[in-house]
UniProtKB/Swiss-Prot annotation:
The cysteine framework is XIV (C-C-C-C). This is Conotoxin Cal14.6. GO terms for molecular function: ion channel regulator activity; toxin activity. The modification 4-hydroxyproline is found at P57. It comes from Californiconus californicus (California cone). Coiled coil: none annotated. One of its GO terms (cellular component) is extracellular region. Residues 22-38 form a propeptide. It comes from the Eukaryota. Probable neurotoxin with unknown target. Possibly targets ion channels. The keyword Disulfide bond applies.
């Protein structure tokens, strides 16, 4: 339930930024979402970790 709340907030924030400031940098939104949810990737694979926070080369972000 907590996850859905954070997801809703992230999506609302994304749509607000998109309408107010033009196109959104997807990497920035992903970092914002991870910060809100509290999910962090290891330093050696900051953009390719899976839900267990382990490096996963096939994971799309």
């Amino acid at each position: 339930m907590k996850f859905l709340l954070f997801l809703s907030v992230a999506l609302l924030l994304t749509s607000f930024i998109e309408t107010e400031a033009g196109p959104v940098n997807e990497a920035g939104v992903e970092r914002l979402f991870r910060a809100l949810v509290g999910r962090g990737c290891p330093a050696d694979c900051p953009n390719t970790c899976d839900s267990s926070n382990k490096c996963s080369p096939g994971f799309p972000g």
